[in-house]
């Protein structure tokens, strides 16, 4: 990164395994569905009598929320019972982590309600409390300040989104979540990854962090002088670099597009309004348009001075607007920089341009929308165009594999108001003594504890800690020898991921290893089973019965070697193992192969 004005901060969220925060339900679930119910959430005012922009936006989307009640949720998650007092183990863990991060611990824990009406909480708000403030960590590029350590409830897990309805599972709602927020002291994307790792060590070392694929999530706060962008829910450390690189390119593009539009005379909002052009498209052969006309009508609007900026060369304003309309349930939009296209011919679009009195430098947007949505969408698109051109880029965005997409406006203080069901909690001596028993340590101490606990080398322990694989090591070591578990995590799985260009959920790998352990299979059989999983995507229950896991006897190995020699293949002690692997699917003990050579 070469931009001088870049500022980066992180908000890192860690799920805890202590039991849910405001009820006595466990955090884990068998996945059993008990029943479902629906809710419609409406915006409310903050304690200052204002309505938050993000909450207003979600309210205008007018969606229905369906909730799946699971075996680890109760009436508290359904918002039919008041919350219980917060989980003391979770509080003690949060205090331990805050202390390790050099924070000042507050004398009182005061919960607040944060208005959230995207459906991720049945109540329409999330409960959160500050535990510690004014901390810091030392890094290779200087001190990074920790602004707050909070303890809050996690959101419901989105399962499905369909026309006008979002389906959530309550299995995740209410899981304790430690949120650690930094000041914008991070210099570049590599530094962001380093900071995220260092903070992660302090939480993982407590032994209280949950072992699940989505148990750690990063929100990346980014600015290069055009307002703060929050990239919410980055699940992988490697993804931090990619989304930051994309966001720099995106904001560079928007700056250039803004300069060009202003040079031309700017965007005239008074001329931006949708007119019905369905009559001009009734005879089109475009499948895209005809499909949209089955459930709505065609509308077009003039975007003064936007020609060439919607999609041409490096400009991509059209994508910015398409992300917005998708949030309102539309599939996207068509615009003049891509037309003719999508089956629309020049004879289809020229009458639209004529009706709008389009000039050479003007752009045109075409929407296929139900009539009842076009009013609010018109206002939101106009607002967004003006916002982008003025370079007010502050908003919440979501990560994709290598980019970001618009989620909602940036929320602010107007979404906060006091919690009325949970009393203020004094941080007593008992709570502090409980937190003293929970050890939160940095990288070096974590490596030392791994070596002591599992008897593995310092190099391997550092690799596991650096790759944040301590929880996986703990899980695998219940089924395998710790040294073999470390080998699987640091060598076997990375090798197979690279060889077969695929990744598997850790839970699936653990299921396979557990089944192998139940049958007393050795390390060679475990490694062969993992290769079958990666190469064939086979059910673990079937893999354990695969005949390729039957180990060759010494006589069988010697027989294969003799046949290979007779066929003219030169076999030595140096190459016998690699030659055998190419000529048999079954596993074998390498030492036996060497013995066959005398």
Curated annotation (Swiss-Prot):
Determine if Ligase is one of this entry's keywords. Answer: yes
One Pfam entry for this protein is GatB_N
Class of the enzyme per the UniProt entry, highest EC level: ligase
Q: What is its EC number?
A: 6.3.5.-
- Keyword ATP-binding in record: yes
Which reaction is this enzyme known to catalyze? L-glutamyl-tRNA(Gln) + L-glutamine + ATP + H2O = L-glutaminyl-tRNA(Gln) + L-glutamate + ADP + phosphate + H(+)
- Under the GO molecular function aspect, what terms does this record hold? aminoacyl-tRNA ligase activity; ATP binding; glutaminyl-tRNA synthase (glutamine-hydrolyzing) activity
Q: Which UniProt keywords apply?
A: ATP-binding, Ligase, Nucleotide-binding, Protein biosynthesis
InterPro entries from the xrefs? Asn/Gln-tRNA_amidoTrfase_suB/E, Asn/Gln-tRNA_Trfase_suB/E_cat, GAD-like_sf, GatE, Gln-tRNA_amidoTrfase_suB_CS, Gln_synth/guanido_kin_cat_dom
Can you list the GO cellular component terms from the UniProt entry?
cytoplasm
Q: Which Gene3D superfamilies match?
A: GAD-like domain
GO biological process entries: glutaminyl-tRNAGln biosynthesis via transamidation; translation
The subunit field of the Swiss-Prot or TrEMBL record says: Heterodimer of GatD and GatE.
Which family is annotated?
Belongs to the GatB/GatE family. GatE subfamily.
The record's listing under HAMAP family reads: GatE
What is this protein's function per UniProt? Answer: Allows the formation of correctly charged Gln-tRNA(Gln) through the transamidation of misacylated Glu-tRNA(Gln) in organisms which lack glutaminyl-tRNA synthetase. The reaction takes place in the presence of glutamine and ATP through an activated gamma-phospho-Glu-tRNA(Gln). The GatDE system is specific for glutamate and does not act on aspartate.
The record's listing under PANTHER family reads: GLUTAMYL-TRNA GLN AMIDOTRANSFERASE SUBUNIT B MITOCHONDRIAL AND PROKARYOTIC PET112-RELATED, GLUTAMYL-TRNA(GLN) AMIDOTRANSFERASE SUBUNIT E
Q: Sorted alphabetically, which NCBIfam families does this protein's record hold?
A: gatE_arch (TIGR00134), PRK04028.1 (NF003107)
- The protein here is known as Glutamyl-tRNA(Gln) amidotransferase subunit E
Instruction: Write down the species.
Output: Thermoplasma volcanium (strain ATCC 51530 / DSM 4299 / JCM 9571 / NBRC 15438 / GSS1)
Show the taxonomic lineage: Archaea, Methanobacteriati, Thermoplasmatota, Thermoplasmata, Thermoplasmatales
